């Protein structure tokens, strides 16, 4: 509630809001239409901004240096931000307000200094708050399209991760039998 009081006044726009869009990629067999999206925990608006609030009960806030880092496999990759940025990219095309993705880590929200605002920037450098995702949307979509092309490419081989801890919360573990 402290975070909401600090952000107030705002208008609650929705909870558990499904957002989806179709994305086309090229394959050797022709074009493939994919539905991408997910469920946004909460949407609220204030002025000319629509804020995505993604609640997190665990994990640690991470600050990506840039969009590329979201698509680079690494143990410290800020994967929660990827999900929220995907929602933001979809919403940027569905309405005219600025879209501000945010992550609300429940276990950290009681701190006076905590802010759910996502920031980007290099370590020990000034950070840029992501208050208008439109500035990042084109690069995010370009890299997402490239990733999906790679996933559906018959030339690429995909193997299971060696780190089975990553499988604990994976939506696809039933497919790979982990």
Q: Model features per residue range: what roles?
A:
Residues 1-178:
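RecB-family 4Fe-4S metal-dependent nuclease core
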């Amino acid at each position: 509630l402290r975070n909401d009081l600090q952000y107030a006044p705002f208008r609650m726009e929705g909870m558990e809001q499904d957002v989806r869009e179709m994305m086309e990629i090229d394959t050797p067999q022709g074009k493939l239409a994919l539905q991408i999206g997910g469920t946004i925990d909460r949407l609220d608006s204030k002025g000319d901004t629509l804020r995505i609030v993604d609640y997190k009960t665990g994990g640690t806030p991470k600050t990506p240096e840039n969009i590329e880092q979201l698509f680079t496999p690494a143990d410290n990759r800020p994967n929660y931000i990827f999900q929220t940025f995907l929602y933001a990219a979809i919403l940027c095309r569905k309405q005219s307000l600025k879209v501000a993705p945010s992550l609300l880590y429940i276990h950290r929200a009681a701190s006076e200094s905590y802010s759910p605002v996502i920031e980007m920037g290099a370590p020990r450098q000034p950070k840029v708050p992501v208050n208008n995702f439109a500035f990042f949307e084109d690069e995010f979509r370009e890299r997402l399209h490239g990733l999906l092309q790679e996933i559906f490419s018959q030339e690429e081989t995909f193997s299971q991760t060696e780190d089975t801890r990553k499988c604990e919360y994976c939506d696809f573990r039933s497919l790979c039998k982990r």
